[in-house]
Regions:
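Hydrophobic cores of alpha-helical transmembrane segments in multi-pass integral membrane proteins
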Residues: 1-24, 42-72, 81-142
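Juxtamembrane inter-helical linkers in multi-pass membrane proteins
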Residues: 24-37
Length: 142
């Protein structure tokens, strides 16, 4: 849950950055552009710093869940939809770690849009799998 909270905060930072960008484009005041860009850069920095513990906690949750599954069912991984979507979420956020090697992630606007869209995987993992898809972690048929 800690990872989901941090990822939600990153997503909210992205929405705020997009709102600031929209406000900047509507006003077009030259002196105000530098202030807005500075705020967007600060939001980007905060989001990038929060991405590390968020992804760590997400990975730790997947790892501990696998250990618990081995104790309970005798296997670490069963390719259950919840497990698969947790892995997809982990990989999607893992891509954002490569901001130095992937030039497109250096642009704050792209980074924030990516973080907003990446949060859809969190929503699918948390709600979609539980209430829509089947599997061990599903409440859709209950």
């Amino acid at each position: 849950m800690m990872s989901y909270a941090l990822l939600a905060f990153i997503m909210l930072n992205g929405i705020l950055a997009l709102c600031l960008r929209k406000k900047e484009s509507e006003n077009n005041v030259s002196g105000n552009d530098a202030i807005q860009d500075n705020r967007i850069e600060q939001l980007t920095l905060v989001s990038r710093l929060l991405l590390y513990p968020a992804t760590f906690f997400l990975g730790a949750g997947i790892f501990l869940g696998a250990v618990w599954a081995n104790v309970s069912w005798g296997r670490y991984w069963a390719w259950d939809p919840k497990e698969v979507w947790a892995l997809i979420t982990f990989l999607v956020y893992g891509v954002a770690f490569h901001s130095q090697s992937l030039r497109i992630f250096r642009k704050p606007l792209f980074f924030h849009i990516y973080m907003i869209l990446a949060f859809l995987t969190v929503l699918m993992t948390y709600f979609g799998v539980n209430y829509v898809l089947g599997g061990m972690h599903s409440y859709a048929n209950a």
